[in-house]
Structures are given as C-alpha cells and as structure tokens.
Amino acid sequence: MNAAFIAALFILGALTLDAMAYSPTCEGKPCANNTDCKGSNLCQCRPPRGDDWRNFCSEY
C-alpha cells in the first residue's frame, strides 16, 4: 500500500513538473505591435477576439 502511494505521488509529481516545464513567454500578453511580443519567431501580436478589445501575443 505504501509503495503504491509513493509511486502515485512520484508519477503525479513528474506530470506536474512536465506541465510546468513549458513557461509561456509569449501567450496572452497585451501588445501594440510585433516588437512587444518576446519569445520565438512565431510569437506575433494578434487582433482581439471575442469580447476582449486588446491585442495579445500568441504563437498560433
């Protein structure tokens, strides 16, 4: 029982660290033009969507 519990915690911790490894340096930041968006070359200033009136940085 204890070994199964420890294994479950280890797997959960590994999944959590894997999820945290991606640090979004681009996603969701407000911008006025492409120079405001830092990160990879795919990071661009996108027009607003939905009911949000601000431009935002996104890789997609």
UniProtKB/Swiss-Prot annotation:
A Gene Ontology molecular function term of the record: toxin activity
Compartments where found: Secreted
Source species taxonomy: Eukaryota, Metazoa, Ecdysozoa, Arthropoda, Chelicerata
Motif (Cell attachment site): 49-51
Species assigned in the record: Ixodes pacificus
Task of the protein: Tick salivary platelet aggregation inhibitor that plays an important part in the anti-hemostatic strategy of ticks. Inhibits platelet aggregation induced by ADP, thrombin and thromboxane A2 (TXA2). Blocks platelet adhesion to soluble collagen (most probably through the binding to alpha-2/beta-1 integrin (ITGA2/ITGB1)) and binds to purified glycoprotein IIb/IIIa (ITGA2B/ITGB3) in a dose-dependent manner. In vivo, reduces thrombus weight effectively in a rat arteriovenous shunt model and inhibits thrombosis in a carrageenan-induced mouse tail thrombosis model.
Signal peptide: 1-21
Record protein name field: Ixodegrin-Ip
Keyword Signal: yes
PTM comment: Contains 3 disulfide bonds.
GO cellular component: extracellular region
Family label: Belongs to the ixodegrin family.
Tissue expression profile of the protein: Expressed in salivary glands.
Keyword Cytoplasm: no
Top-level division of the source organism's lineage: Eukaryota
Keywords: Disulfide bond, Hemostasis impairing toxin, Platelet aggregation inhibiting toxin, Secreted, Signal, Toxin
